[in-house]
Amino acid sequence: MLPRLGCVLFCSLVVLLLSCLLLLKERIPAGSSKAHQQFLALPRSHHSQCSPNLTVVNTSLSLPSRHRLFLTYRHCRNFSILLEPSECARDTFLLLVIKSQPAHIEQRSAIRSTWGRAGSWARGRQLKLVFLLGVAGPVPPAQLLVYESWQFDDILQWDFAEDFFNLTLKELHVQRWIAAACTQAHFILKGDDDVFIHVPNVLEFLEGWDPAQDFLVGDVIRLARPNRNTKVKYFIPFSMYRARHYPPYAGGGGYVMSQATVRHLHMAMEEAELFPIDDVFVGMCLRKLGVTPIHHAGFKTFGIQQPLNPRDPCLYKGLLLVHRLSPLEMWTMWALVTDERLKCAATHKP
C-alpha cells in the first residue's frame, strides 16, 4: 500500500505544480484583485518600514546571530497581509489554523486531501481550514502561491520572513486576523502542517465545552527549563528570561481553545513583549490571563512513543491529534483510519 500511496501523492503534487504554472495567467487575469497585484510587485525587504534598535545591537554582541536579529527587530510587530482567505461563515464551529511555509506545498496538499477535507467529517458542523505563511525567498514563485490562494481560499500570508523565531509573529498576527475576520468561530485548533487531526474525535470532544468560557487543551508541558546551551535552537539567555522554569504551556504541534480564550489571548499578546519561542509565549500570555492550560492525553505533540506502535491505525482512532507525520504517512493513516473494513479489538481511548 505504501508504494502505491507514495506514487499517488507524488503524481498529485506534480499535476498541481504543472497546472499552477500553465494556468496561472489565464486563471488570474490582468484585472485581478488589487491584493494580488500588490503582492506580485511587493519588494522582499521584510524590515523596510521598521528601523533596527541599535541600542540592543550594541548590548547583544555576545549572543548568537539569530538572537541578535530577534532582539534588534523585536519591536517590529506590524506586518502587511499579502494573501488572505475569505472570512469565516457565521455558523463556523471549528477554525483549523495550520502553521506552514511557502515551500510546504506537499504538506498542504496532503492535509486538504485527508483530514483537512473537513466537510466530509463535520457531521453538520461548519469547519474552516487556514494555512499560516510568512515569506521565504523565491521558491516557490510568488505567482504559484497566488494561484494556490485563489484555487483553495485557505492561504493567510504576511510580509515577514519565515524563521523559527518569527513563529511568535504568526501567533500575534493570526490573533489579529481572527479578531477581524473570524470572530464567529466557536473553537480554534492550532497546529503544524505535519500533524494528523482526527476531526470527528475533536468535534465529539468539543461538544462538552462552552465557547464562552476560557480554556485551552493540549499536550501540556510543565516545569520546563530554559535551555542555556548556545548551540541549540531553543537557547534562551538569562538576559531574555531569568526564571528557572517556563509557565505551563501546550506543545505548539497542536492545541484547541475556546472563542473566549482567543479573544483574551489577543488582548494579552498585544500588550506582551515578544518571546522567540511561540509555545512558551502563548503560555506566558495565558499566565497573565490567569488561564491554566489543560492536559489531554489525546494530543500527541511529540508523536507516538514506544512501546506503542506509531503505525497502528486503531491507536489513531482513539486520539485527537498526532504530531510529526510526513505527507505520505498522513495519506496512509487517513486511508486506514477511514476504511470501514478496519476492525479494532479495542478502541485506544486516551
Swiss-Prot record:
Listed GO MF terms = N-acetyllactosaminide beta-1,3-N-acetylglucosaminyltransferase activity
Residue ranges the record marks as coiled coil: none
Reaction equations catalysed: a beta-D-galactosyl-(1->4)-N-acetyl-beta-D-glucosaminyl derivative + UDP-N-acetyl-alpha-D-glucosamine = an N-acetyl-beta-D-glucosaminyl-(1->3)-beta-D-galactosyl-(1->4)-N-acetyl-beta-D-glucosaminyl derivative + UDP + H(+)
The organism's place on the tree of life at top rank? Eukaryota
Q: What Pfam families does the record point to?
A: Galactosyl_T (PF01762)
Query: Topological domains (Lumenal): residue ranges?
Result: 26-350
The residue spans the entry assigns to the Cytoplasmic side of the membrane are as follows 1-4
Q: How does it sit in the membrane?
A: Single-pass type II membrane protein
What is its pathway? Protein modification; protein glycosylation
Q: Name one GO cellular component term.
A: Golgi membrane
Q: Where are the transmembrane segments?
A: 5-25
Q: What is its EC number?
A: 2.4.1.149, 2.4.1.-
Name its cellular compartments: Golgi apparatus membrane
Which keywords label this protein? Glycoprotein, Glycosyltransferase, Golgi apparatus, Membrane, Signal-anchor, Transferase, Transmembrane, Transmembrane helix
Describe the family membership recorded for this protein in Swiss-Prot or TrEMBL. Belongs to the glycosyltransferase 31 family.
What's this chain's function? Beta-1,3-N-acetylglucosaminyltransferase involved in the synthesis of poly-N-acetyllactosamine. Has activity for type 2 oligosaccharides.
Protein name as it appears in the record: N-acetyllactosaminide beta-1,3-N-acetylglucosaminyltransferase 4
What organism does this protein naturally occur in? Answer: Mus musculus (Mouse)
